[in-house]
């Protein structure tokens, strides 16, 4: 990467981090003043109302980060993504404030995706060698892109159930995709990864460690970050991009993206499939996600987030091992599919059996979960005071 490009990435990261660190408290005051809060109910895991405009603070960081990078490099390829993020942020905030029909949200997501396809040429038009397939015809590419982008947006939204999970996942995914984009010198995509990490880190600290400064990212933030995650996926596998050269290196781009997206995608598919089997709407909320399972087994929010993210990292490591061992792109895909199912649906089913039978394994897991409650530890208190500015 050229020096000016690298400088632009660093400036964008610092600017996005600093802006969110500054505006977080102000956005929180707005949320409290206008009663934009998430109230406890039978399905929620918090015990008191929590401000829910964290996505707005993150959006400020993303916008300022892009502006800060503009003197150093061309950010025009990211403007369609920014527009899509803005629309989904507005829709999500409206949902947080007054509640929207899931079908209306679904329709908006489809429209936004189609605009990205036709106006910004963002489509899944290449399998990058999976099963020997490269270019995908438009009649297949368009519906495939709609399903993938809308699915990813909703998957990120659905994992937003415990402190730090959706933001922590997006930070992890941004690092993973950022490494890929750095390898192929895709500068605009690297900037998007950098400002995503920079904007999410301050929010993550407040969301996880804060007490008086705790704020949820909300539907606005999770839908917005779903657009970012889907743009990573499209940039990784679409034709004509910098990542095309990865196929020559033996890197399975479809397996890689699926590995990074493992927990949101596989867990969402499992949950929706089970809802359909129970003859309920796939969009009907319940408490059957992986993070609900860890909470039920006695883990803290922080412990739950770390465990769920660890499961995702394990799948990425399985993919990396298969690549390093020289596996073909097809074999890499099968490794990701098998490990993804095992570490999500398989793990969920295994622990459900342990809970039903009250086994020794369950008692050990519960004992481990109890150790994740560290709110009384000095280091936790120090972090809490630091983020609350006490």
Give residue spans per PLM region:
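A generic, lipid-embedded transmembrane alpha helix
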Residues: 51-67, 114-119
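Membrane-embedded alpha-helical core segments of multi-pass
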Residues: 86-91, 108-123, 144-154, 170-176, ...
